[in-house]
């Protein structure tokens, strides 16, 4: 017999009541933290020092969650978010906090989590890598939303904590040329006969122009392709269709791959290849990595999770003998092409799953320096082989401070000391950040 949950009267009353709280600090996801009846309460949108009126939405044994209803006493660091979809769209969650305080919060969060793994207080450099705080994204993936009642299609991003899509016509953190394409693209897609066959739309600003990849779940009619092609040529963008198997079809006149420029180098990438979305910060991040690692001609440097060569090529340009390793075959092939495009012959690339046993890999051996730029899961398995590699310096670029903190324990156990730690503000207006850590062998 099925049993249905029914909230107890007292519990329902507790959740519906509004209470006033004093916010103490922010958590690692950017939510305000307060205390109520001995419990920690998480309040998205609230800032430290504020007195807020909230409604409890969830009660657990040791904590509760609440929805911000009203700010009674605002923090001097609070600002009005310029985005009309702020609070609905799940993209930016710190637009209400001034940029200097965003950076301070991220430095503190990075230092706190790494300090716990180091079992000592770690100082984060105050000269963080940062750039423009608005219109900085050179790539974005927009979801499509087709209203079954009106048969109207909208483009947008996922709603916070939901699979629902919030329709938008511009984006304050997307590069202006891309933001200005959202509304015209939505109008165009609504003219297509096969608009029910459309998936996401990926927009990219490259050094050689604007690129759009439209995902389709079934082939489009020729008349639809003509509309798309005319739109692309009129706006001078490269437009590609991507089918279920990942196959690409150019609908525009230009067939050149997108590329970006870095340290005088040209790095091409295919749609679907990972690149850093913040081009300005990526430039500064790579420059800082070169400075911290201090590579000299002839040194053997291993670049794990190398992608299309974002760090490998600048390292090779400095005269190092570089070995790049990446788990995606297509990106390994692109990295090799990028080396050839730039006339660099002092580097080699290998494809390997860096989460598996690396004992038989031909590239695993003594090196002078190691650079890692893993995905959010980190590089725990790779770092187990430190004793075989014995690099004098390890530079770890992390998009997940929690993974960096966990992995740093392996470095400490292997005799390394954390000598520099810096914030890389790749994603302004959000709680997300990257960290750069330099470890040096003590003995």
From Swiss-Prot:
Gene3D superfamilies: 2.40.50.1070, Nucleic acid-binding proteins, Vaccinia Virus protein VP39. One of its GO terms (molecular function) is RNA binding. SUPFAM superfamilies: Nucleic acid-binding proteins (SSF50249), S-adenosyl-L-methionine-dependent methyltransferases (SSF53335). The keyword Ligase does not apply. It comes from Shewanella amazonensis (strain ATCC BAA-1098 / SB2B). Catalyzes the formation of 5-methyl-uridine at position 1939 (m5U1939) in 23S rRNA. It holds the Pfam family TRAM. One of its GO terms (biological process) is rRNA base methylation. Belongs to the class I-like SAM-binding methyltransferase superfamily. RNA M5U methyltransferase family. RlmD subfamily. The keyword Methyltransferase applies. The gene is rlmD. It catalyses: uridine(1939) in 23S rRNA + S-adenosyl-L-methionine = 5-methyluridine(1939) in 23S rRNA + S-adenosyl-L-homocysteine + H(+). This is 23S rRNA (uracil(1939)-C(5))-methyltransferase RlmD. S-adenosyl-L-methionine binds at residues 276, 305, 310, 326, 353, 373. Its EC number is 2.1.1.190. It comes from the Bacteria. Keywords: 4Fe-4S, Iron, Iron-sulfur, Metal-binding, Methyltransferase, rRNA processing, S-adenosyl-L-methionine, Transferase.
């Amino acid at each position: 017999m099925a049993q249905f949950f029914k909230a107890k009267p007292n519990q329902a009353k507790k959740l519906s009541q509004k209470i006033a709280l004093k916010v103490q600090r922010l958590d690692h996801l950017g939510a305000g933290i307060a205390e109520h009846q001995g419990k920690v309460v998480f309040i998205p949108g609230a800032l430290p020092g504020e007195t807020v009126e909230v409604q409890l939405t969830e009660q657990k044994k040791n904590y509760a969650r609440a929805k911000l209803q009203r700010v009674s006493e605002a923090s001097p660091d609070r600002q009005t978010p310029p985005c009309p979809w702020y609070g609905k769209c799940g993209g930016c969650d710190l637009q209400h906090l001034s940029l200097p305080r965003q950076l301070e919060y991220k430095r503190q969060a990075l230092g706190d989590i790494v300090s716990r793994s180091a079992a000592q207080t770690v100082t984060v450099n105050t000269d963080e890598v940062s750039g423009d705080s608005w219109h900085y994204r050179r790539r974005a993936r927009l979801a499509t939303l087709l209203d079954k009642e009106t048969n109207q299609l909208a483009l947008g991003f996922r709603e916070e904590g939901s699979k629902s899509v919030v329709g938008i016509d511009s984006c304050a953190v997307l590069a202006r040329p891309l933001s200005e394409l959202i509304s015209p693209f939505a109008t165009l897609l609504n003219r297509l006969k096969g608009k029910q066959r459309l998936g996401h739309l990926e927009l990219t600003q490259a050094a050689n122009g604007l690129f759009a990849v439209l995902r389709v779940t079934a082939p489009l009619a020729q008349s639809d392709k003509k509309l798309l092609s005319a739109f692309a040529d009129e706006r001078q963008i490269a437009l590609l269709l991507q089918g279920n198997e990942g196959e690409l079809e150019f609908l525009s006149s230009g067939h050149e791959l997108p590329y970006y420029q870095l340290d005088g180098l040209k790095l091409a990438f295919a749609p679907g290849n990972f690149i850093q979305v913040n081009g300005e910060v990526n430039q500064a991040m790579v420059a800082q990595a070169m400075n911290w690692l201090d590579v000299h001609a002839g040194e053997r440097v291993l670049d794990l999770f190398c992608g299309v060569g974002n760090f490998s090529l600048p390292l090779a340009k400095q005269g190092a003998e570089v070995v790049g390793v990446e788990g995606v075959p297509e990106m390994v092939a692109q990295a090799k092409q990028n080396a050839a495009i730039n006339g660099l012959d002092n580097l080699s690339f290998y494809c390997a799953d860096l989460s598996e046993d690396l004992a038989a890999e031909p590239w695993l051996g003594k090196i002078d320096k190691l650079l890692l730029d893993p995905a959010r899961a980190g590089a725990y398995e790779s770092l187990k082989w430190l004793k075989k590699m014995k690099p004098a310096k390890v530079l770890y670029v992390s998009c997940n401070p929690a993974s960096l903190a966990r992995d740093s324990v392996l470095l400490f156990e292997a005799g390394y000391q954390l000598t520099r730690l810096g914030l890389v503000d790749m994603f302004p207006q959000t709680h997300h950040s990257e960290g750069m850590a330099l470890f040096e062998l003590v003995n």
